[in-house]
Amino acid sequence: MSSVGYHEPIEELSDETRDMHRAIVSLMEELEAVDWYNQRINACKDEQLKVILAHNRDEEKEHASMLLEWIRRRASTFSKELKERLFNENPIERE
């Protein structure tokens, strides 16, 4: 995955930037895992296995949520956007 690497020399990056990179890459991986589990559930014929896969998928959602909150607490602009756009009935595309 190209997102795992750095675009600038690592020795020029602060600890905060490297930690944010770790969190963003981890969030991407968790969301990718949710997608993979959704596909497996959709293709699976065994109902018991579907339940297990759904449980695993939902744990990935928990992990993604924790990472998103960690990012929100450390990135003020991201925090502002999330607070304005999440958990309301306003149009998503509003400016």
Task: Name each region found by the language model.
Residues 1-95:
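Iron-associated oxidoreductase/ferritin-like identity signal
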